[in-house]
Amino acid sequence: MSKYQIDIEINSASQQLPSEEHIRQWISTALDSQQLDEAEVSVYIVDTDEGRDLNREYRERDYATNVLSFPADIPPEVEIPLLGDLVVCAPVVEHEADEQHKPLDAHWAHMLIHGSLHLLGYDHIDNDEAETMEALETQLLARLGYADPYDEASYPEAIPTNPAPRRQASSSAGHIE
């Protein structure tokens, strides 16, 4: 039995979702990096409209983004292993993987590790924080057999993961308008 409780709810029509086993493996890899005794994380996989609604409501940004992290707000004196919730917008992850010529499973792994690290207190607001977080993401992904997601040379010959025509995206990375 795992020391982590990872609940997964899918509200997406995507036919390209990773298995629940992979989702749990990727999140557990991030949690293991912090040597936690136990943890609870909820993962909610959504489509573009819901992703946009949540991003607008909680971040005041009117577009769907790849992953939203909602750390649990539990007082320190309450001993509950709840870390928080992750919301992943499947169409955005698929679009980004295609646009960046990355294998879809590698990008899913990256987004779930990235979101999990946010739940663990990591951030990328300033350059030092970003370097620390990106280095840990790269290390964890390498442990899983994936290339450095920040090194474009890691995917020079990659075949686009989505054979469908590309969607129109704004110039900002990480979202679909």
Swiss-Prot record:
EC numbers on record: 3.1.-.-
Protein localization: Cytoplasm
Chain sites annotated for binding Zn(2+): H114, H118, H124
GO process terms (BP): rRNA processing
Co-factor binding comment: Binds 1 zinc ion.
Needed co-factor(s): Zn(2+)
Tagged with keyword rRNA processing: yes
GO CC, any one term: cytoplasm
Entry keyword set: Cytoplasm, Endonuclease, Hydrolase, Metal-binding, Nuclease, Ribosome biogenesis, rRNA processing, Zinc
One of the record's GO molecular function terms: metalloendopeptidase activity
Sequence ranges of Polar residues compositional bias: 168-177
Keyword Magnesium on entry: no
Stretch list, region Disordered: 154-177
PANTHER family: ENDORIBONUCLEASE YBEY, CHLOROPLASTIC
Similarity comment: family membership: Belongs to the endoribonuclease YbeY family.
Name of the protein in its database record: Endoribonuclease YbeY
